[in-house]
Each structure stands twice: as structure tokens, then as C-alpha cells.
């Protein structure tokens, strides 16, 4: 029988040829539609989301370089903000496909035709809640990358006559996402499983999903700390409802060493046979306790080597200077870690990816309490323990205590810098924190010196030069993809008109970024 049904494909957010969000499929029997159990949908959604956020493209060539954790060993143009439009188009689509997949998990547990059958895989309400929480986690990454983006209309694409998605104002979108987290947490029944199988992140534990939802609410709230006084009440609500209580509560995705279900970072190096990335000089120096004398920047605990230095990049003594032209690459990478030959833990096929850690929450709570010492020090200890375990390493209690003592008491800068260190591999969140707080100051801004000239030590040092206009600061956002300008033109134009100078650029700030200069550190509301 020739019939038509609609489903979200999540290409560009409009209907047009193969890039449409609504695709018509023919020759399906409406009385016997193909059914995929909701636990399998969730498993597939989790893998799709983590695969496409933590890979060598969205993370490796964008978010991790923007946070200056790692950079390219050969071709530095992307580190200097020359973004491949093909990559930008693709990952805008891929991340929205993740949103679409999670919406489908919700629908399968709401639809009277499918919900009863899917209750065999976990309480329907708990499945909906888990999908909502992960959807908010992903949507936060999307909006903190591009700014105001489609959201409200996305869920209407397959069920209502909506073919072109408007762009939600980012400030309003944050409110929507927080409301979704509240709704998700409220519907969780901790006496029932979220999933009986298929949930790779929490193994179906509804209590853990609730803690993640509340902890994620704290993350979104702290993002707004410079612009919205309600951030404190939002965190208070989340804490009262139940947040992470230890490293065992962290939201993580465990890859497998068997078959092809391996970590995408591993794939980008060893399956694809490429040796493109290593640790940056700014991050290596931060871990090693080394000041930036070229730019006259001190180190907040100079002379103290971080125990995590040899976890993240074994034996590191220097990193690759960030933002230098590619013509210097061969000389500048000499003596820096070669991850292809000395494999760090994050390049293992079965690496456990962190979506959010307990340590991050502790740093949020320290800031919430006026930069309290107890949560600050608990965060450092938890971070060292978490990362040591994730990499199969160990740090003695004495070494942890000595490091924490050397770091000293909590300040706004120290909390921000320790949080930045813990956010390793979470490039978008670290980039968000740099834009929100202005820390770490060790992160290079365009126009600053990155290294001595390797060809002439007496010459002026080489500068970090941006290849796109960023107004002298770190990149503030990624441009909207060009596909949107053609496939969702009217909504794209309306969104661009609200950006600084009315152009699709890299320097328009997020609503929560109120810094007035490159080293401004705005106070919390």
C-alpha cells in the first residue's frame, strides 16, 4: 500500500531536498509501521550524541582548540579560527539529529500505540525523563556554540505543519531548557528503572539520571551568573532535589574495545592513521606550574606541577605553541608529546567519556557559596581521583595533599582555573567558562606572543594570529552554517539581524558573556 509517514531526519532545519527535516517515506503499511524498542532507540541516541560531540572534528578541530587544551601538530589554520564550512554544516546537522533521536524516545513513551509495549524496557515516565535530560545536555552545547538556534519548532516538525524552524532567542532558550530539566526530574520514579537495558550512561538507574538532571541544572544556572540573579535560587533548588554526591555519580559513556564500538578519539588517530593533535603550550604550562613570561602573565600557583599533567599527557615537558602559522609546525612540535607513539588514556579504544563530573559540580558549588574553600578543595581532590581512575593511573594521598596545599585557598581565579583543568576533553564547556569568567588568563588571546621565533631567537616572538575577525578576543561563537542561509533562509536572516553588526560573524557574544575586554572578569549577580 502506498502511504506516506513523516519522521525527523534532522538535516538543516527546513524542508528541502535531501537536507530536509521532514522526509516522506513510501510503501509502508500504516497498520504495521516498523517499530524499534525504546531501549534500543536510547542506546543508539546516546552513542550518536557522544560519537559526534567527542570526536576529532567537532571536538578535535573546534572545541578543544578553542579551549586551548590541544592543537594541531601540522596544519594550524583551524586553531586560528579558519573554520571549514563543510564541517560546520555537517555538525550542525549531526547534533540536531541527536536531538531528533531523543525526541523520538520521548514520543515512543507517550504515544498510546507504543507506550504500553515500551514499558517493558523501563517505566515510561523515567524513559522520557532520561531522554529529556540528555537532550538538554546536548542542546546546551548547541546553543553555546552557535548562539540563538532552533529548538521550540524542532519537535513540531513531524507532528505539526511546521517546515521551517524559527531560531529561539538564547536567553529564552535557557529558560526553556531549565524548565525541561525541572519537568524531567519531577517525573522520575526512583523505585522504577529508567531502562532495563540499552542505557550506556547510567545502566538504567533512574536515581542517577535524577542527580544528573539536577547537576546539569546547576551548570546552566552558573552560566547565567553574570546576567541573571536567579542563578542562585536555581542552584539551591537543584541541590535540595539531589545532585552528584561523588565520582561514582558522574555522567559517563563507556566505550568498548571489542568490535567497532570504540572511542572516536581513538578512531581519529589509530583507525584513520593520523597524528594530528597534541597538548598546547598554554595548557601544558598551566599543568606544569610555568608562567607565561613572553606575555608577562604569572601563574596562580607557579612552580607546582599538577598530578594530572602525567595523566593527560605522560611525561609532558612542553606543549605546542598555540596559534602559530603552519610554516613553523615542524620545528615547534619538536620535543612535544607525540600521542600517536606514546598513547595517552583518552586515545584508548574503550575510554570512558565524561559528560559531567562530580568535580565540576563542586567547583560550581564553591562559586555559588562565594568561592568556598571546602567545595573548592573537594573538587580538586575529586578531579585528580576521577582522572587518575579514567586513565588507569594512581596518585598518592600525599601527592594530592601537597598539590592542594600548594594551590592554596579558593579565589574566583583559582576556582575557574581548577574547573578549567577538570573540564579536560569537554571543550565546549571549557570554552564557555573562558567566555563567562575571562579565566584562565593563561589562555592566549589573538595578538599575544605564542613562542620565540624558531628560526631566529633574536627576532620578535611569533604571535597568535587569528584568520577570522574576532575583535582581538578568543572566538565568541561559531557562524551559523551556510546551509541554513539557503534552506531556512527567512529564519536565518532574522537570527543574523540580531547579531552584532547584523552579520553572521565569530565575535557576537552569548547573552551570558558580558566581558567588556579580553581580560575582564565580571562579578556575579
Language-model-detected regions and their locations in the chain:
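Conserved, well-structured interaction surfaces
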Residues: 70-152, 156-196, 351
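Bacterial Sec-dependent N-terminal signal peptides
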Residues: 1-30
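Specific register positions within alpha-helical solenoid repeats of the TPR/Sel1-like families, i.e.
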Residues: 49, 140, 144-147, 188, ...
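Internal, well-ordered domain-core segments that constitute the primary functional module
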Residues: 172-246
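Hydrophobic-face positions in mid-chain alpha helices that act as interaction patches
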Residues: 231-365, 370-422, 426-429, 437
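Membrane-proximal, proline-rich intrinsically disordered regions
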Residues: 21-68, 74-79, 85-86, 104, ...
Amino acid at each position: 500500500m502506498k502511504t506516506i509517514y513523516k519522521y525527523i531526519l534532522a538535516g538543516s532545519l527546513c524542508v528541502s531536498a535531501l537536507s530536509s527535516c521532514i522526509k516522506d517515506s513510501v510503501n509502508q503499511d500504516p497498520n504495521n509501521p516498523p517499530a524499534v524498542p525504546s531501549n534500543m532507540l536510547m542506546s543508539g541516541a546516546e552513542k550518536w550524541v557522544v560519537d559526534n560531540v567527542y570526536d576529532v572534528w567537532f571536538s578535535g578541530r573546534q572545541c578543544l582548540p578553542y579551549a586551548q587544551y590541544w592543537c594541531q601538530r601540522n596544519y594550524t589554520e583551524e586553531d586560528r579560527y579558519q573554520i571549514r564550512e563543510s564541517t560546520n554544516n555537517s555538525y550542525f546537522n549531526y547534533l540536531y539529529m541527536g536531538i531528533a533521536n531523543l525526541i523520538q524516545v520521548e514520543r515512543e513513551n507517550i504515544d498510546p500505540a507504543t507506550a504500553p509495549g515500551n514499558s517493558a524496557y523501563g517505566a515510561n515516565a523515567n524513559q522520557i525523563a532520561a531522554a529529556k535530560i540528555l537532550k538538554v545536555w546536548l542542546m546546551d552545547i548547541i546553543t553555546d556554540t552557535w548562539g540563538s538556534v532552533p529548538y521550540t519548532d524542532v519537535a513540531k516538525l513531524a507532528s505539526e505543519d511546521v517546515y521551517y524552524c524559527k531560531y529561539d532567542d538564547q536567553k529564552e532558550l535557557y529558560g526553556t531548557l531549565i524548565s525541561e530539566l525541572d519537568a524531567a526530574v519531577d517525573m522520575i520514579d526512583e523505585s522504577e528503572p529508567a531502562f532495563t537495558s540499552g542505557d550506556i550512561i547510567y545502566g538504567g538507574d533512574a536515581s542517577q539520571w535524577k542527580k544528573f538532571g539536577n547537576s546539569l541544572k546547576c551548570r546552566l544556572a552558573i552560566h547565567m551568573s553574570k546576567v541573571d540573579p536567579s542563578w542562585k535560587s536555581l542552584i539551591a533548588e537543584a541541590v535540595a532535589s539531589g545532585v552528584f554526591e561523588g565520582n561514582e555519580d558522574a555522567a559517563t559513556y563507556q566505550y568498548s574495545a571489542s568490535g567497532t564500538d570504540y572511542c572516536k578519539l581513538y578512531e581519529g588517530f589509530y583507525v584513520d592513521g593520523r597524528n594530528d593533535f597534541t597538548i598546547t603550550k598554554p595548557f601544558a604550562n598551566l599543568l606544569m606550574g610555568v608562567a607565561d613570561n613572553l606575555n608577562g602573565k604569572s601563574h596562580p600557583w607557579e612552580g607546582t606541577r599538577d598530578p594530572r599533567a602525567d595523566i593527560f599527557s605522560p611525561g609532558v615537558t612542553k606543549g605546542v605553541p598555540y596559534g602559530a602559522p603552519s610554516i613553523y609546525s615542524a620545528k615547534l612540535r619538536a620535543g612535544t608529546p607525540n600521542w600517536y607513539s606514546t598513547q595517552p588514556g583518552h586515545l584508548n579504544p574503550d575510554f570512558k567519556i565524561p559528560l559531567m563530573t562530580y568535580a565540576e559540580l563542586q567547583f560550581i558549588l564553591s562559586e555559588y557559596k562565594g568561592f568556598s574553600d571546602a567545595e573548592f578543595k573537594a573538587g580538586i581532590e575529586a578531579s585528580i581521583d576521577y582522572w587518575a581512575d579514567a586513565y588507569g593511573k594512581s596518585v598518592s594521598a600525599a601527592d594530592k595533599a601537597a598539590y592542594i596545599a600548594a594551590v592554596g585557598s579558593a579565589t574566583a581565579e583559582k576556582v575557574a582555573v581548577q574547573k578549567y583543568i577538570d573540564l579536560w576533553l569537554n571543550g565546549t564547556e571549557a570554552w564557555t567558562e573562558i567566555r563567562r569568567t575571562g579565566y584562565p588568563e593563561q589562555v592566549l588571546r589573538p595578538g599575544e606572543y605564542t613562542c620565540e621565533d624558531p628560526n631566529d631567537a633574536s627576532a620578535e616572538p611569533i604571535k597568535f594570529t587569528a584568520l577570522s575577525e574576532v575583535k582581538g578576543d578568543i572566538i565568541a561563537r561559531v557562524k551559523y552554517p551556510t546551509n541554513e542561509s539557503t534552506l531556512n533562509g527567512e529564519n536565518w536572516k532574522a537570527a543574523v539581524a540580531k547579531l552584532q553588526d547584523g552579520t553572521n560573524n565569530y565575535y557576537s557574544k552569548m547573552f551570558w558573556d558580558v566581558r567588556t575586554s579580553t581580560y575582564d572578569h565580571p562579578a556575579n549577580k
